[in-house]
Amino acid sequence: MQTGYLMLFQNAHEGLPDVDMVKNEMRLAELTEECGFDVCWSAEHHFDSYSMVPDNVQALSYLAGRTSTIKLGTAAVILPWNTPIRVAEKLSMLDALCDGRLVFGVGRGLARTEYESFGIDMEEARGRFDEALVD
């Protein structure tokens, strides 16, 4: 069996500055390696304190320099919201920074509010997702 930790970057504590929430989340992520976890995952969400991590590749890049054995995974890169070539470039760089420890997960996204904020019709999700996988 393998064990993993999912970073959601939730700010559930009223009055806690977002910067402190991010630092706390990163400290927990670093501890997962010390505790023997196999993988540390990061979600991608936008525009809501439920999960405040608009760029999970950036968050994992930070961890790449702070860890040495734990795998680092995207849970997930939401393809309809990202340009496929930029996703490939960013993941290539992250994989190099973490010496091949990257686990790449993709998704379509599920929150209508996120689609609306990006100005994307949610009905386009499947087509955008499929097109990104082919590109």
Specify the residue positions occupied by each region the protein language model found.
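Active-site nucleophile and cofactor-binding loops and adjacent substrate-binding regions
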Residues: 74-82
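Structural motif
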Residues: 43, 75, 105-107
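Catalytic metal-binding/acid-base residues of hydrolase active sites
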Residues: 46, 77, 109-111
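Short, basic, helix/turn surface patches
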Residues: 66-74, 101-103, 132
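Glycine- and other small-residue-rich loops at beta-strand/loop junctions that grip anionic moieties
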Residues: 52, 76, 125
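N-terminal beta1-alpha1-beta2 module of alpha/beta enzyme domains
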Residues: 1-72
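Flexible, glycine-rich active-site loops centered on histidine and acidic residues
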Residues: 2-20, 81-135
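Short, flexible coil/linker segments at or flanking structured domains
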Residues: 25-28, 60, 75, 90-92, ...
